[in-house]
């Protein structure tokens, strides 16, 4: 570093401490980057790359961003997965002796960003810590912007995947063992657009992790936090806490609680089910419109929007908890006038959770405090209205809601109603709040009057008509005279600067006024800054009260949203049972009915139980509505268990521990799996993890392979699921394999349903109605016609359909079903080694005549291509003659 400037030496020393970060180094009004960081940032942000002399042979690559636009540039870099260390000036350069003191004040990473501009207010921004120890995964999750902090443990990769999918963390930190746990970390990165990094081993010391948690939460034992059964989870939580301390370099005083949870406390919804049911985003466009969240979200606050997402992702499994939410919604429905008033008062409320986070971090600006104050103004009105309700959940929310009138009063007295964004420009503290501030402000105001008087006197004295007193930060106050009047300037004017069209001067009197005014301004700005920090710290000390109120507001917001949706959409309060019965009368798909106009949606019934109606085989043509019907049932069950009313005339919902769906066909390009492989992987997951209390939705199992393989797999899956000794889960099973309808009457609990279709000549009309019985046709050719397939193809398809229908496998399917009727259901189809295997045995109904026999005896290996074609032509002619 010989020959380098002291500033550049300090820059490199600082950079050495943060080698994995881009270093934003404050120099005056800019944050500058040098060397590799400059090359990276200029490319990623598309900003100009320049150079700086630093004592080396070549100029150092350099680029910079304005300090007032920091958040925007930070957000763009963090979105791309970079970490950024911010080195700030710790003293006023005017007062500094020698090199200005600078130090890193925080490190911003994808999981620790707190800027309101950078965050989606409707979503949490999670940092996840994962440790893999003794074949268990400890998981800790924190949203540093809101103070949420949760911990759990799981034993399998599948459970871990469910938790990652549930929280969709922006950043994952882990121990080295995680990379050899069997988890495909590259797939996790790509699928969730997250950053994964291993931390040094000291982050995962059991003793160190326990110590940092006890110190932060001020407890002598972690048992008091409910962490006694989470040994691996504690290590994950301690690592996350230390990482947040190291990056934020603050006390994290707004993280006041840690919540341990078991994955079994809520309905488990795996990754494919979340995707297939389109709970939070659509499968194709990845948009909110067209999802269950889109239908249910009428929340007014950011806190409520985030909580509603959590409700959808974590449906309840305890009857009392579900009924508590239902009763709250019902009472709000009955008192809709009060509900609408509450919504009006909720609407102006800002994001209290994230505001108190920024206040605790000391990053909140004056306008944040005004937003905070304006939000608090609504609380007394909401408190009064909530006092009218009597249901336990609404009473609990009323009790938790603290109007925070003392905090509101403090901000109202101290901060002006329309303050500047910057803390350093003054104009923050309201008149009458602090005596010394008022005095200095008066001196500043009078000083401007004195300047105006001086300007008038000098203009009269010199005769310079356009003489003006002006100011800038470099030269202070000065007289400005245009060149046309330069000859009239008196001798006591001292030149300060020459411009192209004017000259700038000062005088003894102007210098005296300048010292007086600027002295008052400097003192005023310093005093105002100190007073603002006092007010901010006073609010931060009330973090527990504010967070409790924020949670209450979020809960009220979600309940009023669900109530408003139930009223508008004619939803009903479902009964909840623990007997495994799902009985829905005239159920409707909550999303599809909102996407359709003029109430055209056709409602349908669903009945499933644990005995005689375990598995419904649903047949019917494509486009008839099978998938919509099955998704509709799953969504109604999920809505009921999150406590919502449901789209039906009547519903009685048995609590499900999990919902599984296998709907639709798509290759998983991210993991390199074909459609069929994806399908079989998901089926395997269902068969291994479902219980008799689960709801399973399977659509078209067995596609992507040969007809016989597909039918065999689908058949075996039906037998396995419907067998109460093996599984016995409630299931909706849509299929094009009409042969499976033969299982009704031979396997207990299996029933056939189909989509009603009306034929009009060669055309069909889908009635969208589920009726008892199996479909006798697939109507595939008619669907192709509806889709616009050319007439010539349709005509040929009809000809082939007639020919191929002769090779009917239905009769053989019926024989197998009846043969299996007296055997255990999981062995209904005889094992391959227990039967006389014949090639294409399902086609035994096709008579093995001389043509078939001759085909079987052909020695293709000894035939030339011409011989083979001649033989094929002869056999074809023989077959045609027989048909004629």
Locations of the language-model features?
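Conserved catalytic alpha/beta cores of large enzymes that bind or transform nucleotide phosphates
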Residues: 164, 169-177, 183, 198, ...
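ATPase nucleotide-binding head domains, primarily ABC-like/P-loop NTPase cores
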Residues: 35-38, 230, 300-301, 311, ...
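C-terminal tails and terminal domains of large nucleic-acid-associated
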Residues: 841-884
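Active-site phosphate-binding and catalytic loops of NTP-dependent enzymes
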Residues: 87, 110-119, 251, 389-393, ...
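Amphipathic heptad-repeat alpha-helical coiled-coil/stalk segments that mediate oligomerization
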Residues: 204-212, 219, 267-271, 283, ...
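Charged catalytic and DNA/RNA-contacting regions of genome-maintenance
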Residues: 1-331, 347-360, 364-456, 823-830, ...
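Amphipathic alpha-helical coiled-coil segments
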Residues: 322, 329, 339-345, 372, ...
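Charged, surface-exposed helical/loop "interaction arms" that form contiguous linear patches used
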Residues: 351, 361, 365, 375-378, ...
């Amino acid at each position: 570093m010989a020959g380098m400037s002291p500033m550049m030496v300090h820059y490199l020393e600082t950079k050495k401490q943060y080698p994995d970060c881009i270093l934003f180094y404050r120099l005056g009004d800019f944050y500058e980057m040098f060397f590799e960081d400059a090359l990276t940032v200029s490319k990623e942000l598309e900003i100009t790359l320049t150079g700086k002399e630093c004592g080396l042979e070549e100029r150092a690559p350099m680029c910079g961003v304005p300090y007032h636009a920091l958040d925007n540039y930070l957000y763009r870099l963090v979105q791309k997965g970079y970490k950024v260390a911010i080195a700030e000036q710790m003293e006023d350069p005017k007062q500094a002796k020698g090199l200005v003191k600078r130090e890193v004040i925080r490190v911003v990473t994808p999981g620790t960003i707190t800027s309101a501009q950078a965050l989606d207010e409707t979503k949490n921004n999670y940092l996840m810590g994962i440790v893999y120890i003794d074949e268990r995964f400890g998981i800790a999750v924190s949203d540093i912007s809101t103070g949420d902090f949760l911990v759990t443990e799981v034993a399998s990769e599948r459970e871990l995947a469910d938790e990652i999918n549930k929280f969709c963390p922006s950043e994952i930190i882990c121990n080295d063992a995680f990379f050899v746990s069997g988890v495909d970390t590259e797939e996790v990165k790509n699928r969730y657009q997250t950053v994964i990094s291993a931390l040094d081993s000291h982050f995962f010391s059991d003793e160190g992790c326990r110590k940092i948690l006890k110190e932060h939460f001020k407890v002598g034992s972690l048992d008091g936090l409910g962490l006694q059964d989470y040994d691996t989870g504690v290590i994950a939580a301690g690592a996350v806490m230390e990482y947040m301390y190291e990056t934020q370099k603050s006390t994290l005083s707004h993280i006041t609680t840690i919540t341990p949870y078991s994955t079994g406390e809520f309905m488990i919804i795996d990754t494919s089910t979340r995707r297939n049911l389109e709970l939070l985003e659509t499968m194709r466009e990845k948009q909110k419109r067209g999802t269950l969240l889109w239908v249910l979200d009428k929340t007014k606050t950011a806190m409520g929007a985030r909580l509603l997402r959590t409700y959808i992702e974590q449906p309840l499994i305890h009857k009392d908890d579900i009924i508590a939410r239902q009763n709250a919604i019902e009472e709000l429905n009955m008192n809709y006038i009060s509900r609408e008033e509450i919504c009006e008062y909720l609407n102006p409320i800002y994001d209290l959770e994230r505001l108190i986070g920024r206040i605790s971090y000391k990053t909140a600006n004056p306008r944040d405090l005004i937003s905070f104050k304006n939000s608090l103004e609504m609380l007394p009105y909401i408190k009064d209205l909530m006092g009218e309700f009597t249901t336990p959940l609404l009473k609990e929310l009323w009790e938790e809601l603290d109007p925070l009138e003392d905090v509101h009063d403090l901000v109202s007295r101290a901060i002006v109603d329309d303050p500047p964004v910057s803390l350093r420009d003054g104009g923050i503290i309201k008149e009458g709040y602090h005596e010394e501030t008022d005095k200095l402000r008066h001196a500043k105001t009078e000083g401007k009057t004195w300047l105006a008087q001086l300007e008038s006197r000098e203009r009269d004295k010199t005769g310079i008509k356009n003489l003006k007193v002006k100011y800038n930060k470099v030269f202070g106050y000065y007289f400005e005279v245009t060149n046309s009047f330069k000859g009239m300037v008196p001798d006591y004017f001292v030149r300060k600067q020459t411009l192209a069209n004017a000259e700038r001067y000062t005088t003894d009197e102007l210098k005296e006024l300048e010292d007086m005014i600027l002295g008052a301004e400097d003192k005023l700005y310093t005093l105002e800054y100190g007073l603002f920090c006092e007010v901010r710290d006073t609010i931060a000390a009330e973090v527990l009260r504010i967070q409790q109120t924020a949670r209450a507001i979020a809960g009220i917001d979600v309940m009023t949203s669900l109530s408003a949706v139930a009223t508008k959409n004619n939803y009903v309060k479902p009964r909840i049972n623990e007997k495994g019965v799902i009985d829905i009368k005239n159920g409707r798909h909550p999303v599809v009915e909102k996407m359709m106009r003029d109430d055209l949606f056709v409602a349908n019934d669903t009945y499933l139980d644990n005995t005689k109606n375990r598995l419904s085989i649903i047949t019917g043509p494509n486009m008839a509505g099978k998938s919509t019907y099955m998704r509709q049932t799953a969504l109604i069950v999920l809505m009921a268990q999150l406590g919502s009313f449901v789209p039906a005339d009547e519903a009685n919902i048995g609590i499900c521990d999990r919902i599984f769906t296998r709907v639709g066909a798509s290759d998983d390009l991210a993991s390199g799996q074909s459609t069929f492989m994806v399908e079989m992987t998901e089926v395997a997951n269902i068969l291994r993890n479902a219980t008799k209390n689960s709801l399973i939705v399977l659509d078209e199992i067995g596609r992507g392979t040969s007809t016989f393989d597909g039918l065999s797999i689908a058949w075996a899956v039906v037998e396995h699921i419907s067998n109460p000794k093996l599984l016995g889960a409630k299931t909706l099973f849509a299929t094009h394999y009409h042969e499976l309808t033969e299982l009704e009457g031979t396997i207990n609990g299996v029933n056939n349903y189909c989509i009603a279709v009306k034929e009009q000549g060669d055309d069909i009309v889908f009635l969208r109605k589920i009726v008892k019985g199996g479909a006798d046709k697939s109507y595939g050719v008619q669907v192709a016609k509806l889709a616009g397939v050319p007439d010539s193809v349709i005509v040929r398809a009809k000809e082939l359909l007639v020919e191929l229908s002769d090779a009917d496998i239905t009769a053989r399917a019926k024989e197998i079903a009846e043969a299996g009727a007296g055997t255990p259901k999981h062995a209904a189809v005889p094992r391959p080694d227990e039967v006389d295997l014949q090639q294409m045995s399902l086609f035994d109904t096709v008579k093995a005549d001389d043509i078939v026999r001759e085909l079987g005896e052909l020695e293709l290996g000894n035939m030339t291509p011409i011989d083979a074609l001649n033989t094929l032509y002869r056999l074809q002619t023989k077959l045609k003659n027989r048909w004629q």
